[in-house]
Amino acid sequence: MACTTILVGKKASYDGSTMVARTEDSQNGDFTPKKMIVVKPEDQPRHYRSVQSSFEMDLPDNPMTYTSVPDALGKDGIWAEAGVNEANVAMSATETITTNSRVLGADPLVASGIGEEDMVTLVLPYIRSAREGVLRLGAILEDYGTYESNGVAFSDEHDIWWLETIGGHHWIARRVPDDAYVTNPNQFGIDHFEFNNPEDYLCSADLKDFIDTYHLDLTYSHEHFNPRYAFGSQRDKDRQYNTPRVWIMQKFLNPEIVQDPRSFALAWCQKPYRKITVEDVKYVLSSHYQDTVYDPYGSEGTPVSKKVFRPIGINRTSQTAILHIRPNKPQEIAAIQWMAYGSMPFNTMVPFFTQVKTIPDYFANTYENVSTDNFYWTNRLIAALADPHYNHHETDLDNYLEETMAKGHAMLHAVEAQLLAGETVDLEEENQKMSDYVQGETQTLLNKILFDASNLMTNRFSLSD
């Protein structure tokens, strides 16, 4: 999918957590309704068949429970996208990335292989660490191949790993430095790799021979190996579609660094100028190039500059999950899955405890027809109504975001305090309370946006009886 990813190491985050976040964006002209569910062991397939390809394989008989954000309609496959399992291991898959003809000539894509549709279902229920996730997915890639190029994130309380596929059967992975964050658009990202450091770098067994055989290393002999040069792209499209997204995220998280939005040398990871919060992650994944000439809603640019770069906060985002694995917490509340549906400049992030058996209907009961009975369609309505007059509605949107996320933090603090006091807490009930609150606030926002948008219609007239 046409997504944007940010990964935050535990020493770069405000609370010592690891954070993995990604927008799932549909293709241009398409929109994909999503829902959040819990997949219990009895619901996990023992023999898996893909819809997008002819791939199939037997799965282990001991899956763990895990959260999932599948397509609501299911006609194109599962597309589970993001979740946390009962071992508090998280996975986000996938970020569609680029490749090049040299790689594809050496290791062609495999039409019968796996893709984004399949990966979470095949891996997340069976792993007990982020590293295990890399190794399981890597083994499947080597055995079955893939029909597309993808980046995949795995995280646990201690580590975040980022894996990128190379051609049909190869892969490479790097552990995110603890004191750094990673920004990754739809482009091959890893720009440094050490073959002699398996603690922080992993790859398919024959990758070094593969590189040597097909002359893929484009670095000089005295330089470190740069996988982005070997396996990635430097296309004109990347300068319009990909590198600007990295630039604007790093501009916010490292304002002291001056960079070119069209540069191919933007770093895969950076140490932020201060620690990163959940709100920061929400902000950068909602970015439309605020305070630059590239902002389509701004006043600084020209009609041309406002349309030149692809925003992160785009109209066709299906869902966004922040997988927040917190240290030094009771295990049942260590993992939080913050969820948003729809276009990011117009929504909020809602926290859910993941060690549960069900998800509230407002987030789980998405269906084909437009309705205000669920979070997905209500957010889509708000975005479509507010977009033509964004600056008029901006204060209402900001207030809604601040108030609902404050309520989310308050809920997390209250539940932790209860558990530490020895009280019993029903986490499904707490999730339901949060959902009910957000449903009320979202309906209130929709009412206000609709009223204001109606008064801004082109056919309005100031005189009345």
Swiss-Prot record:
Keyword Cytoplasm among UniProt keywords: no
GO molecular function: cysteine-type exopeptidase activity; dipeptidase activity
EC number: 3.4.13.19
Reactions this protein catalyses: an L-aminoacyl-L-amino acid + H2O = 2 an L-alpha-amino acid
Pfam families with a match to the protein in the record: Peptidase_C69 (PF03577)
Keywords: Dipeptidase, Hydrolase, Protease
Active-site feature positions: C3
Keyword Protease: yes
Swiss-Prot/TrEMBL GO biological process terms: proteolysis
Class of enzymatic activity (EC top level): hydrolase
Entry similarity comment: Belongs to the peptidase C69 family.
NCBIfam families on file: C69_fam_dipept (NF033678)
Protein name as it appears in the record: Probable dipeptidase A
Organism (species): Streptococcus pyogenes serotype M3 (strain ATCC BAA-595 / MGAS315)
Gene: pepDA
